[in-house]
């Protein structure tokens, strides 16, 4: 479940493919704008926030389509996305990622940092994990969080934005299945 191939499939399936149709398209990013707006407002919908997020997500879709929609059909398949990650991200640090990936990673952090304190603690990590997978025991999630965090992370009270960016970059750019970044999104399942 922690192979590079499965991790990239996981990103497509659980982070971008909001409408669950098996590929990425403009609709996914329109849905992401609504999701991010509601999360940022903790359930309240701000028309101004939505307008901003809709523009950000439209730009993000355009950049991702430019990087990954190789056959220009308005859809990015899992294979196209993997090729784009391989070409643009694999073996690179966050600072060297295309802007589209950087923006998405920053937005992802904001949606996980529910209390807005600039840190993702174990409680927020748990909430993030249960939005994508089913767990019979919270210990499974807590064990993944312990594997993810370094002693410095634990002393700081969690993962800050810079650390999250570094971990996300390792998640999609590093093939090492033992890398602690493999646990960024919780215990992973094999993606079909």
UniProtKB/Swiss-Prot annotation:
SUPFAM superfamilies: EF-hand. Ca(2+) 3 binds at residues 113, 115, 117, 119, 124. The modification N-acetylalanine is found at residue 1. Residues 4-39, 56-91, 100-135, 136-171 form the EF-hand domain. Signal peptide: none annotated. GO terms for molecular function: calcium ion binding. InterPro entries: EF-hand-dom_pair, EF_Hand_1_Ca_BS, EF_hand_dom. Keywords: Acetylation, Calcium, Metal-binding, Muscle protein, Repeat. Ca(2+) 2 binds at residues 69, 71, 73, 75, 80. Ca(2+) 1 binds at residues 17, 19, 21, 28. Pfam families: EF-hand_5 (PF13202), EF-hand_7 (PF13499). The keyword Plastid does not apply. It comes from the Eukaryota. Like parvalbumins, SCPs seem to be more abundant in fast contracting muscles, but no functional relationship can be established from this distribution. The sarcoplasmic calcium-binding proteins are abundant in the muscle of arthropods, mollusks, annelids, and protochordates. SCPs from crayfish, lobster, and shrimp are polymorphic dimers; three isotypes (alpha-alpha, alpha-beta, and beta-beta) have been identified. This is Sarcoplasmic calcium-binding protein, beta chain. It comes from Penaeus sp.
């Amino acid at each position: 479940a922690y192979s590079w191939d499965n991790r990239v499939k996981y990103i497509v399936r659980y982070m971008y493919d909001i409408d669950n149709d098996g590929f990425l398209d403009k609709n996914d990013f329109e849905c992401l704008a609504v999701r991010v707006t509601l999360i940022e407002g903790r359930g309240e919908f701000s028309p101004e926030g939505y307008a901003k997020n809709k523009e950000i997500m439209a730009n993000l879709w355009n950049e991702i389509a430019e990087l990954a929609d190789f056959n220009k059909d308005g859809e990015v398949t899992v294979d196209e996305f993997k090729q784009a990650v391989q070409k643009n991200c694999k073996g690179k640090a966050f600072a060297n990622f295309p802007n589209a990936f950087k923006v998405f990673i920053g937005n992802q952090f904001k949606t996980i940092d529910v209390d807005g304190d600039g840190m993702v603690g174990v409680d927020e990590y748990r909430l993030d994990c249960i939005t994508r997978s089913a767990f019979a025991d919270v210990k499974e999630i807590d064990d993944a969080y312990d594997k993810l965090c370094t002693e410095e992370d634990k002393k700081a009270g969690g993962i800050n934005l810079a650390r999250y960016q570094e971990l996300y970059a390792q998640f999609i750019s590093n093939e090492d299945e033992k890398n602690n970044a493999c646990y960024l999104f919780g215990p992973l399942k094999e993606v079909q």
